[in-house]
């Protein structure tokens, strides 16, 4: 079970949002690169970056801190990024800069042809972020709920050749209310590619619950508010996940 610290970037700072609301942000660090080094020192095996301003603008908006993060971690661990990725040029620039995986969210739902092209151009490096509430996919920073069924879209995107899916239960994200294991497992059983859980992870019991379904295809989790506010000790959580995998 791969536990991945999230670094959400807004105006050059590391923040956490509640329910995806840009106006409800808690600043956790003025120095995102130092935060990246902190998670690396604690044994993180991958980092998850989100350009929140970019997600709104539809193009990269936190390039300086992203570059600083990549310099801080070097080649030690892979870094994945999402937020505002709408064209192949942006993907290419990120990969050339040292990003390992690019996450496509809203653009994958609105423009499946773009996702298909991206998977073809950059095989093994495209992850899809699917945000859902009650089984329906949301787009545009969660502001719009579509009629798309999350399971149907996941299968379609797998067929396009995406590397993995990050599934966020948007009713729980940033709320520390517990991960939606059932919905995550349903999705993981529906596809053959890895699924990463996101949203609501509050403590060690959530990690243990996800470890119990790792064989169903839930291969990791994105950790946010819980590790920033101290509800979850990252090092202890990864150690426990490794122990349960034996």
Swiss-Prot record:
It catalyses: 1-(5-phospho-beta-D-ribosyl)-5-[(5-phospho-beta-D-ribosylamino)methylideneamino]imidazole-4-carboxamide = 5-[(5-phospho-1-deoxy-D-ribulos-1-ylimino)methylamino]-1-(5-phospho-beta-D-ribosyl)imidazole-4-carboxamide. It is found in: Cytoplasm. The active site is at 8 (proton acceptor), 131 (proton donor). GO terms for biological process: L-histidine biosynthetic process; L-tryptophan biosynthetic process. Its EC number is 5.3.1.16. GO terms for cellular component: cytoplasm. It comes from the Bacteria. Gene3D superfamilies: Aldolase class I (3.20.20.70). The keyword Transcription regulation does not apply. InterPro entries: Aldolase_TIM (IPR013785), His_biosynth (IPR006062), HisA_bact_arch (IPR006063), Isoase_HisA-like (IPR044524), Isoase_HisA-like_bact (IPR023016), RibuloseP-bd_barrel (IPR011060). It is an enzyme of class 5 (isomerase). It holds the Pfam family His_biosynth. GO terms for molecular function: 1-(5-phosphoribosyl)-5-[(5-phosphoribosylamino)methylideneamino]imidazole-4-carboxamide isomerase activity. Keywords: Amino-acid biosynthesis, Cytoplasm, Histidine biosynthesis, Isomerase. Pathway: Amino-acid biosynthesis; L-histidine biosynthesis; L-histidine from 5-phospho-alpha-D-ribose 1-diphosphate: step 4/9. NCBIfam families: 1-(5-phosphoribosyl)-5-[(5-phosphoribosylamino)methylideneamino]imidazole-4-carboxamide isomerase. Belongs to the HisA/HisF family. This is 1-(5-phosphoribosyl)-5-[(5-phosphoribosylamino)methylideneamino] imidazole-4-carboxamide isomerase. It comes from Bordetella pertussis (strain Tohama I / ATCC BAA-589 / NCTC 13251).
